Amino acid sequence: MSKIQTINDVLNDIRQKATTEKEKGTEFERLMKRWFLTDPRYENLEKVWLWEEFPGKGDLGGSDLGIDLVAKDDTGDYWAIQCKCYAENATIDKAAVDSFLANSSRQFLDDETMQTRQFSNLIFVSTTRNGWGQNALKATQGLEKPFTRINLFELESSSVNWGKLYKGEEGKKALKSGKQPRAHQLQAMSKAHHHFIEEGNDRGKLIMACGTGKTFTALRIMEEMTDDKSLVLFLVPSIALLGQTLNAWMSDKSEPMRAICVCSDAKATRKMKGEDDDDESVVDLAVPATTNVKSILRQIKVAEREKKRTVIMSTYQSIDVVSDALHQAGKYVDLCICDEAHRTTGVKIKDRDESNFTKVHSDEYIPARKRLYMTATPRLYKESIKIKAKENDDILCSMDDENIYGKEFYRLSFNKAVQSGLLTDYKVLVLTVNERDLPYTVSEKIKKRSQAVKKEDLLKELNFDDATKLIGCINGLSKRIKGDGGSTVEEDPVKMRRAVAFCQTINPTKANPNASSTQMANYFEE
């Protein structure tokens, strides 16, 4: 067991030692109980029971009917948790969740208050890489209670020491050691203190290149500028970024903090015709999210009672809920942090509804004592656009407007980050491929496949445009470009070892992996 360091090491050991499926499942449930009592994201859990330990199990039928763990948080809410130790590539089907959903909707008696209770949050933990069947996904949609699914990725990215946890330890002694700020982050922290505290400015811009640790720097700035009575608002443009920030801040914090996630699928992933039918979802956040104002206010009160900073992490799309909560409570935000702040630019047109992304600038809408805008790519507008907006009596939010965004107190450019050794140097290779350059076999296969599938499924198929781009990627990776006379590989003969491809939408990411190896073979055959 001394060599066990990762969750995968633990799972392999459990599978090897278990003589039955029941034994494997029981060991995994015990591990997950310790995990929930250790991972910083679940600090608000006061108790976690194995099913056989739960006092209210008799009211729910007594026997194991899908609920493996029960947790109680510091607001008095109960969580139903199912734990599945499946193979990494397994798919969660509807049968795996049906009994859990059915039994977690039943009532039970709270043995402390002697009141009838229901579960408020539903958590499904599995050791798969998010392999959920369509029917299982549909069964978890539209539920009245928050449903959260935790997969292998979340377990792998947890800040716990899996070796210690597997040995039976839990709590702070089973956590990994935290991060320490690097020189450029310390400089940014010092500049922030000077700008906001010493000079007394209420707005300011932090510009840092991608990959240099903006999120961690913002955490340390927040901890220096606020105390245990403070209320902080952190805004992001997507659920995925909210999840990343939640994980990073709860893992790296050096002082007590309570995170409240505010977002919903309906608000953060509004679908337009022609867009993907599959997107990031609140069910993939590590902790339950809410858009219920009463729930938000209740959590704020608990944090105040426990003398913890309250950090509301919200998408810009759910800013209306945050505004309602602040006004109902009569509270000010001590520090509002706007991540990806370039998204908050744009024109506020007179007599039209304002974008959720620009509402954050208003003190009336979001009462905040200080605002920190951070981005790697500040967005500015040309003078002609500014003049036109002024002529139309519109308000233009441009990041060079210090009345809205404040002064820039720290900048770390991509160039400086590369020179400092913080980022790897890079080159830009522009790949130009025409549809005429597609090999005949490739174009014919795409054409036949497109004719064979249903019209509604065409978006999920690899089309000519995607195939052309894919050929461009193959050219760049292989350096075997037709017609260049071998100049590309001569200039840069070192083989490509790894590549990451970014797609504008999700559907091509599903089609491309299956198509790339086939198209590569067809391409080089010709």
Q: At which residue positions do the language-model features occur?
A:
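ATP-dependent helicase/translocase motor core
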Residues: K3-T19, E23, W35, R41-Y42, ...
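Active-site beta-strand-loop-beta-strand hairpin of nuclease catalytic cores
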Residues: G62, V70-I81
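Interdomain helical connector at the RecA1-RecA2 junction of SF1/SF2 helicase-like NTPases
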Residues: E383-E525
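Conserved helicase ATPase motor motifs in RecA-like P-loop NTPase domains
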Residues: A209-G211, H342-R343, S362-A389, G421
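SF2 helicase catalytic motif II
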Residues: Q328-Y373
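Conserved Walker A/P-loop ATP-binding site and its immediately adjacent core
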Residues: S230-S254, A259-M272, S318, T505-N507, ...
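Conserved motor-coupling elements within RecA-like helicase/translocase cores
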Residues: E275-T310
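Conserved helix/coil segment N-terminal to the catalytic DExD/H
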Residues: I296-Y332
